[in-house]
Swiss-Prot record:
Involved in the modulation of the specificity of the ClpAP-mediated ATP-dependent protein degradation. One of its GO terms (biological process) is proteolysis. Binds to the N-terminal domain of the chaperone ClpA. NCBIfam families: PRK00033.1-5. It comes from Acinetobacter baylyi (strain ATCC 33305 / BD413 / ADP1). The lineage of its organism: Bacteria, Pseudomonadati, Pseudomonadota, Gammaproteobacteria, Moraxellales. It comes from the Bacteria. Transmembrane segments: none annotated. Signal peptide: none annotated. Belongs to the ClpS family. This is ATP-dependent Clp protease adapter protein ClpS.
Length: 107
């Protein structure tokens, strides 16, 4: 049989697929904004409860908010940052405080 076809490939060609390039998600800072009515102790409570800061860390962030007008409570991917900001805003309202929390893109 002169024209038989073989199941074996003619050349050894190796195709190597590149692993997908995974990028880290963009990060957002959860920022507390100063106001003239929310007690400092309440801000510290928020920072401990929602951002797992110890008393010293929470106090430092609270003082930054108080003296500079805003302070970063934590940095997270967008979904988590939005959730934390919403939780803080809802809790502050439920306790009768005007504290505002927002997210900002992290540089």
């Amino acid at each position: 049989m002169g024209d038989s076809q073989s199941d074996e490939p003619e050349g050894d060609i190796a195709v190597q697929t590149a692993p997908p390039e995974l990028k880290r998600p963009p990060l957002y800072a959860v920022v507390l904004l100063n106001d003239d009515y929310t007690p400092m102790d309440f801000v510290i409570e928020i920072l401990q409860q929602y951002f797992a800061l110890n008393l010293d860390q929470a106090t430092q962030v609270m003082l930054t908010v108080h003296y500079e007008g805003k302070g970063v409570a934590g940095v997270y991917p967008r979904d988590i940052a939005e959730t934390k900001a919403n939780q803080v805003n809802n809790y502050a309202r439920s306790q009768g405080h005007p504290l505002l929390c927002q997210i900002e893109p992290k540089d």
